[in-house]
């Protein structure tokens, strides 16, 4: 093989090895509601950041089903699956024990009506509303469209789902 043949072979080998190297698995997900960001952190501390859309219910903890608030707290990815509306849906373990305790206290003191329910089906998913792109410079009111979930672009949720195994912690804060 001549010199140019070796150069081509080395270039192809480098391309194949870099393409075959999967992104590192995620150790923790951190979602900052005010910043509208989701950070994927691997075991070495490397961070990948994505812009996110949330529920339009604003800052603070989720009180009840239908308040359109993205919850604040410590959760885990419990399972995932394909979704016609959201490409992939990665379900979180909301409500957790702390959420249930808060909800029951709010019902007991009359802050919430007797018929209120705590809700569920909170997750990380794709599915951008038709006609706009989260990459555009839009206001928070235009950006926040979910019922309390965390949404990224469809191509992003595909990449995220490959890197985040079930059971991984998800911390959501108001920062």
Predicted features, each with a name:
Residues 22-27, 33-34, 51-79, 103-110, ...:
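N-terminal post-signal-peptidase region of extra-cytosolic proteins
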Residues 46-49:
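Short, mixed charged/polar active-site loops
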Residues 3-4, 8-24:
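Bacterial Sec-dependent signal peptides at the C-terminal "C-region" and cleavage site
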